[in-house]
Amino acid sequence: MMNWKDFKTGKYAKYTKYLKYYLVVKWTIIVVILIGSGKMYGQNATEIIRKMDEQMQGKSSISEMTMKIVRPTWSREIGIKGWSLGTEYSLILITAPSRDKGSAFLKRDIEMWTWQPSIDRVVKLPPSMMMQSWMGSDFTNDDLVKQSSIVTDFTHQIVADTTLQGYDCYKIELIPKEEAAVVWGRIESYVAKEEYLQLLVKFYDEDDFLVNSMVMSDIREMGGRKIPAVMEMIPADNPEQKTIIEYKSIAFDVPIEEGFFSMQNMKRAR
């Protein structure tokens, strides 16, 4: 019968040496693979988010849409026309109803202004107002102008695979970087694997409570690419209410100059 002394000093000693060497090499390889795959996993998650963002944004765009605010006892609809150039510039014009027609919102880099023709005044919105409701909807000013970038202001990690609306999806967790001016504690993004379509987004506050869920649906080809034509923002604390944005038309990669996004043009945009 073998005992431990045989392995340490007896005829099995040389095999013990080989076994130790084998175990060291084996675990070294495992650790290297795990570390390497972790890095690739993070890189893949960031690339997925980047491709998804490019799919929806393009280099530039001109769009027309409607926004319907739904409440338990009433609803109202707003017509919108929008121009964008990259992630730095955007101009939003209200086209209906008549009482709001002509109101405009301008974003240049991280600054935002609003133009109210009824009072003939341009107002710069301070950062403290970015989380306030936009036009009485469930979208915020930050949602409107995307002051924070889901690509550059967050780290990304694939945390699960799932299925939504018949699409195989990645569930990706976005954690804000320390230096980023981000209002959310974290975000969960559900992205279709093959199409790079974002189908669901969950927004959590700094205490990790769910604040809003945004559901994308009605996938169709618009502007030469496949995108969700409908977005619904649903607050977690008031699930009986929601705001629905539906794209009527959109054109991508259209020629727009930076000079278009000016306070002067905000007043005369049509």
Segments (PLM) and residue ranges:
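Extended lipid/amphipathic-ligand handling interfaces
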Residues: 52, 80-84, 216-221
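Hydrophobic residues embedded in beta-strands of well-ordered beta-sheets
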Residues: 89-90, 112, 122, 198
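N-terminal, post-signal-peptide region of Sec/Tat-exported proteins
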Residues: 64-99
